[in-house]
Each structure stands twice: as structure tokens, then as C-alpha cells.
């Protein structure tokens, strides 16, 4: 499937969300809207000959003799069986999701099972995060790891409004795929 067809599939998946909402309710529509972005990442990786893994659990570093074995984000991306990227996916990114993603990325960065060259990104439709939290958590990640966390907002209405949901047909244009940002994400994956 070409990248153009993958983008068309994204649009088709978003077009189905109002029906999901009317037939199955808000919870099902919210779950389906999250999958729209995860599926876009997965299909894009497939096209680029990358392996986007879900439930690819890693071990945390040991602290005072304790260690967790369930560390993961939405997609651990492999090239030639070697982990190269970690991506958290959100329909919209609020400060709670940003904080959690940054903390998970820091733990991944410190994991003995994650190569030191792994890069980190958040792939989201819209931004629901206040500016202070947005600036702080990006800076905190840099302070703790020495690395940048990339954040891609792929919908043209980058600022979220809770009254303009993705599964409301009236606001469909807010959720078109921004091809410029999507292509930036593709180029980042290729690096």
C-alpha cells in the first residue's frame, strides 16, 4: 500500500467514526478514534519496511533491587530487528498524556533493553495541552535524556476543542490529515 493510499485509508477510517458513535456509543467511538492514529502509524511503518510492535514489553532499570518488566509505549519501531524509535499515539494530546508519555520515554531511555540510539516521538491529531506544560515536559525530557522528543500534530485544527469531536460529522474538516506534517513524520521514521 503506498503512502497516498495509507492517507486515504486514514480519511476513510475517520469517516466511519460518526457511524461507530451513533451505533455503539461514545466509549466505542473514543476507542476507535485512538485506533485511527495507531493504524496510520502501523501502516506507514509497514510501507517503509519497519516493524511497529505493540505490547513489546521492556524491563526498567533496577532501582533498590526492584525492576518492572512491563514498560512500553504504543509502538516500538524496529528496523532490521533493532529498535530505532518509540512512538506514543493520541487522538489528542493533553498535559496528562504528555506527562505520561515523557515519563515512559525516560524509563525506556534508561532501560538496559533499549538501545541508546532510539528516538522518541508523540504522534497526535490535536493539541489539548497548555503551553506551560507543553514547554516544560519537552524541556524535562531533554534534561533527563539529552534528547529531543518530537511531537507531530497531524490534523489542520491543531488545537483541540472538546465540543468539536472527531466523531461528529459537522467537524470532519478539523480531522483531515495534514500532508505536510504527515510527510515530516515519514521522513523522521526513515532516519
Language-model segment annotations:
Residues 110, 122-191:
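Domain-level recognition of nuclease-like catalytic cores that cleave nucleotide substrates
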Residues 54-74:
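Long amphipathic alpha-helical segments with strong coiled-coil/leucine-zipper propensity
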Residues 1-54, 63:
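Interdomain/boundary linker segments immediately adjacent to catalytic/signaling cores
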Residues 68-86:
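Active-site beta-strand-loop-beta-strand hairpin of nuclease catalytic cores
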Residues 33-41, 68, 94-98, 178:
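Phosphate/oxyanion-binding active-site loops and adjacent basic polyanion-contact surfaces
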Residues 41-49, 105-112, 141, 189:
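Hydrophobic, Leu/Ile/Phe/Ala-enriched alpha-helical segments that form helix-helix packing faces
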Amino acid at each position: 500500500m503506498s503512502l497516498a493510499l495509507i492517507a486515504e485509508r486514514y480519511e476513510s477510517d475517520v469517516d466511519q467514526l460518526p457511524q461507530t458513535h451513533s451505533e455503539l456509543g461514545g466509549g466505542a467511538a473514543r476507542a476507535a478514534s485512538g485506533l485511527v492514529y495507531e493504524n496510520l502509524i502501523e501502516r506507514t511503518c509497514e510501507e517503509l519496511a519497519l516493524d511497529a510492535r505493540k505490547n513489546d514489553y521492556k524491563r526498567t532499570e533496577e532501582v533498590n533491587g526492584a525492576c518492572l518488566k512491563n514498560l512500553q509505549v504504543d509502538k516500538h519501531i524496529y528496523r532490521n530487528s533493532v529498535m530505532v524509535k518509540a512512538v506514543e499515539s493520541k487522538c489528542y494530546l493533553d498535559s496528562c498524556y504528555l506527562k505520561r508519555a515523557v515519563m515512559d520515554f525516560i524509563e525506556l531511555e534508561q532501560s538496559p533493553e533499549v538501545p541508546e540510539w532510539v528516538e522518541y516521538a508523540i504522534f497526535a491529531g490535536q493539541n489539548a495541552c497548555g503551553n506551560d506544560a507543553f514547554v516544560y515536559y519537552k524541556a524535562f525530557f531533554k534534561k533527563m535524556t539529552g534528547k529531543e522528543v518530537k511531537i507531530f500534530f497531524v490534523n489542520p485544527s491543531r488545537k483541540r476543542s472538546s465540543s468539536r469531536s472527531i466523531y461528529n460529522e459537522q467537524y470532519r474538516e478539523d480531522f483531515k490529515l495534514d500532508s505536510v506534517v504527515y510527510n515530516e513524520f515519514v521522513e523522521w521514521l526513515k532516519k
